Amino acid sequence: MARVKRGVIARARHKKILKLAKGYYGARSRVFRVAKQAVIKAGQYAYRDRRQRKRQFRALWIARINAGARVNGLSYSRLIAGLKKASIEIDRKVLADLAVNEKAAFAAIVEKAKAVLA
């Protein structure tokens, strides 16, 4: 059986990991063993945070909608209930944008929700 020398494959594997670890601090970007662990951990954080980002943005939108609703004399939960009763289907992302950038339009939507609730 012939001897297998893995020089090319090992170097390619190391290069790939070190390329992914580029920009990391200290040994994490230079030493293969440490870099490999850092890259794996970074991947785990990225995977987790892609899911958390969705939760965090939804929480931010709800906070903005709540603030805008309270300025117009309604709580967040009452506003959402009113919008559902009025069959107004605007998602929270758009509502939050209206609450921040288009206060008049948001106020009009809140008034429609109030009218249905009253």
From Swiss-Prot:
Any Pfam family: Ribosomal_L20
InterPro entries, per database record: Ribosomal_bL20, RIBOSOMAL_L20_CS, Ribosomal_protein_bL20_C
UniProt entry keywords in alphabetical sequence: Ribonucleoprotein, Ribosomal protein, RNA-binding, rRNA-binding
GO cellular component: ribonucleoprotein complex; ribosome
Gene Ontology molecular-function annotations: rRNA binding; structural constituent of ribosome
The keyword Ribosomal protein is annotated on this UniProt entry: yes
Role description: Binds directly to 23S ribosomal RNA and is necessary for the in vitro assembly process of the 50S ribosomal subunit. It is not involved in the protein synthesizing functions of that subunit.
Name the record gives this protein: Large ribosomal subunit protein bL20
Species annotation: Ectopseudomonas mendocina (strain ymp) (Pseudomonas mendocina)
Taxonomy of the source species: Bacteria, Pseudomonadati, Pseudomonadota, Gammaproteobacteria, Pseudomonadales
